[in-house]
């Protein structure tokens, strides 16, 4: 499409194209990317680059994407919640048609055995478009890679399933163009994705007779007309703002949270599965040190978190250590360890940002657990004025203070007991912090009132130009397993979580007068780490 921007008939609009044939022209193997998450980050970096070059805000940008690119863009909107004007998706490849039975299962097995290898696409140009010139271009273009790395193909399926099932988290104005005779991707997931979208501004158009290359079809003028009309309407109105004021009460995530509170139906297969799993964890599972610690302090406690960070299997005998290794390798704990790395990197960026602004570096972590990730990130810096770590738990304060002393940081760091949701105690912190950190806390509490009080307290304490590092959990694949088998630090009750979409979390931060400027997310799409700057007063 971007080879013919004039077809959009929008002469007053600047078009920027990202040439991703073969995953771009960077060095390295064609058809390969380290992960689909890295490719999604490419989208984020490209759009922000365009905004900088064009000297416009993200709210002035509409993103158009097709096929795999449409999956990347919809994932970006879901995971990063960018403040763009809207998006147009053409034939998103949410489910590629694999005509060999059990192909996906076989690819997974072969990947485990062989590692990285490439899968060739045998799709012919004549199955993509009716346009002879477009067909010829596809067949002759040497930059179009027929082979795709197996990790990307499998990641595409996995990520697409996540985004389609959780499309209710997307509240951005969206137009979906579906090709009526698509031989490459399935139509059903596209319709499911669209049905879940919660923006009041959305359009779905089915284009009869169109092959997969929607924007490169012979009659593509039909698609371009619909696209132009949609984009014109977006630019003619003010940027659409979704109302998140009751998200913790009336939303799909609130409904899902309430559903968790109802146990599985008695004597159902689901009930028998979770009962058996819970029984096994409470009996044989106690050979694992990690599980024992979870039952003693809560699986969401600072002590458990620190144990997961250390990632050293311990237990009674060989069996205990094997169980502990399996426990530590669960997708949630793997994501937590990636989050630790991401937090440390974002803290580094926060420190650099403060230095650029000639601001003193005074740190507050309002729910630090044992404080390991903060101390790991900051102990090498010599120009930190103060580090104040706080937590509700006496045990965490004791363990954290011991860690401070072990590292010889007692001259600059201290650990105190404190309530992370108490506005007054946060607003009056002395000396006034310039770097606030909230990691893994808000995800544990379903209501937004307490989060608002916490963020307001931090906003009152942090001066304009100061920064906030905060985490989010827009999605989790094990919510039921956690709710029905693990216990919380809160009086040993079941550990139930309400996921907040990234846009909901960012909105809460923005309402507290912080402006998000950077974000990272793990490859599973579970945990985010963001950086925001305290706005000027007034």
Which residues does each predicted region cover?
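Catalytic active-site module of serine/aspartate enzymes centered on a nucleophile-bearing elbow/loop
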Residues: 208-257
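Conserved alpha/beta-hydrolase
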Residues: 6-28
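Short alpha-helix in the alpha/beta-hydrolase fold that links the catalytic acid
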Residues: 172, 186-195
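Catalytic nucleophile-loop/oxyanion-hole region of alpha/beta-hydrolase
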Residues: 24-54
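A short glycine-rich, Lys/Arg-flanked "PGG" loop and its adjoining helix->strand segment in the class I
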Residues: 452-464
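Short beta-strand/loop motif that positions the catalytic acidic residue
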Residues: 170, 176-178
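Conserved SAM-binding loop of SAM-dependent methyltransferases across substrates and taxa
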Residues: 370-383
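Conserved beta-strand signature within the Rossmann-like core of class I S-adenosyl-L-methionine
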Residues: 465-472
């Amino acid at each position: 499409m971007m080879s013919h921007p004039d077809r959009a008939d929008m002469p007053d609009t600047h078009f920027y194209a990202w040439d991703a044939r073969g995953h771009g022209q960077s060095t390295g193997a064609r058809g390969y990317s380290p992960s689909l998450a890295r490719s999604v980050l490419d989208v984020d970096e490209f759009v922000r680059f365009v905004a900088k070059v064009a000297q416009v805000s993200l709210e002035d940008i509409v993103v158009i994407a097709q096929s795999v690119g449409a999956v990347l863009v919809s994932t970006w909107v879901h995971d990063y919640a960018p403040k763009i004007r809207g998006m147009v998706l053409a034939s998103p490849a949410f489910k590629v048609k694999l005509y060999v039975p059990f192909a996906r299962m076989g690819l997974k097995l072969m990947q485990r055995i062989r590692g990285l290898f490439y899968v060739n696409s045998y799709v012919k140009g004549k199955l993509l478009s009716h346009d002879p010139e477009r067909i010829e271009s596809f067949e002759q273009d040497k930059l179009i890679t027929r082979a795709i790395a197996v990790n990307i193909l499998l990641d595409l399926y996995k990520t697409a399933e996540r985004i389609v099932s959780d499309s209710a988290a997307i509240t951005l104005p969206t137009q979906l163009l579906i090709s009526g005779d698509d031989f490459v991707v399935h139509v059903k997931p596209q319709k499911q994705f669209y049905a879940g979208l919660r923006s009041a501004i959305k359009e779905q158009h089915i284009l009869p007779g169109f092959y997969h290359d929607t924007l490169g079809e012979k009659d593509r003028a039909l698609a371009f007309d619909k696209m132009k009309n949609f984009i014109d309407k977006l630019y003619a109105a003010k940027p659409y703002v979704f109302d998140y004021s009751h998200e913790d009460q009336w939303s799909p995530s609130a409904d899902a949270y309430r559903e968790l509170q109802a146990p599985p139906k008695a004597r159902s297969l689901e009930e028998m599965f979770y009962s058996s799993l819970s029984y096994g964890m409470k009996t044989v599972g106690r050979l694992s040190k990690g599980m024992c610690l979870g039952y003693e302090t809560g699986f969401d406690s600072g002590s458990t978190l620190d144990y997961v960070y250390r990632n050293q299997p311990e237990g009674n005998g060989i069996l205990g250590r094997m169980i502990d290794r399996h426990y530590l390798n669960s997708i949630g704990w793997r994501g937590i360890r990636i989050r630790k790395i991401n937090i440390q990197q974002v803290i580094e960026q926060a420190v650099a940002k403060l230095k650029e602004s000639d601001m003193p570096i005074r740190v507050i972590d309002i729910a630090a657990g044992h404080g390991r990730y903060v101390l790991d990130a900051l102990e090498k810096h010599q120009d930190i004025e103060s580090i104040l770590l706080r937590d509700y738990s006496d045990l965490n304060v004791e363990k954290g203070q011991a860690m401070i002393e072990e590292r010889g940081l007692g001259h600059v760091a201290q650990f105190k007991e404190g309530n992370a949701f108490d506005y007054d105690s946060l607003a009056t912190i002395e000396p006034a912090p310039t770097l606030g950190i909230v990691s893994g806390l808000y995800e544990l509490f379903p209501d937004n009132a307490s989060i608002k009080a916490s963020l307001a307290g931090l906003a009152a304490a942090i001066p304009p130009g100061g920064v906030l590092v905060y985490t989010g959990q827009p999605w989790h694949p094990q919510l039921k397993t956690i709710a029905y088998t693990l216990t919380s630090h809160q009086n040993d009750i079941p550990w139930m979580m309400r996921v907040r979409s990234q846009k909901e979390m960012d909105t809460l931060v923005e309402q507290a007068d912080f402006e998000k400027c950077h974000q990272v997310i793990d490859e599973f799409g579970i945990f985010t780490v963001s950086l925001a700057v305290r706005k000027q007063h007034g």
